[in-house]
Amino acid sequence: MKTALSIAGSDSCGGAGIQADIKTMTMNGVYAMTVITALTAQNTTGVRAIQEATPAFLKEQLDAVFEDIFPDAVKIGMVSSSDLIRVIAERLRHYGAKNIVVDPVMVATSGSSLMKTDAVQTLIDELLPLSTVITPNIPEGEILSSEKIESKDDMERAAKRIGDTYGCAVLLKGGHRVNDANDLLYAGGEMQWFEGKRIDNPNTHGTGCTLSSAIASNLAKGYSLSESVTRAKEYISGALSAMLDLGKGAGPMQHNFDLRGEFAKENTK
């Protein structure tokens, strides 16, 4: 069985972070492992508190995973401080990690900040050069490219600038501010658009986490980057279309929408 590692924060309400990643990786057919960068006290309405892992404990987690079950792909999500980013980058280089997907999480769906200001530059310097692909949304893409993004032409310019500057593929997600759900992949000097239907569902907590971990899962299984993005977008469309409605704010998706079998059946007695 192929394996994938999520390096990310814990979401106490289960819709984003490592909880979303474990569900997504499992539903996409790989064995999920986790390294926790931070504990968050959050729900669908916002983030109440963040407790970071220490750099030393983060290193212990990474070593424990890589020395026993080497991951076929790595997804990196919320990493809130420069010290933690440096530990991750050093350990990934040390072990020769492959198929690295970086979701540069800066702000939660609820609007709460998840990254310290100085950590953004450290992420750019340390993690982007190691990445197979990064998956910024429009606001994150503006920060990484130093360009305003308001159209598809802007997306193409920004993705090219990010990819050429940092030497990684870029999946720039068009769901924020651009009036469709189309995403742009810039890889190997080529542009590829992925069309997506906009689903009228306000419950989008954890969509970025889910997409990036689905891409990592498919890379782990040997699909090309383009195929992995296509399959990941199909999966997230299914999870959104299931119309799960939980919580008082932007609720989670139904990650297990395609779960079948005896143990998934509801009690009808």
Put a short name on every predicted segment.
Residues G14-V30:
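N-terminal basic/disordered segments at the start of proteins
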Residues G29-M33, Q192, N218-A232:
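Phosphate-handling active-site elements
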Residues T117-M191:
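Conserved phosphate/ATP/ADP-binding segment of small-molecule kinases
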Residues Q19, E142-I143, N201-L225:
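Short, small-residue alpha-helix embedded
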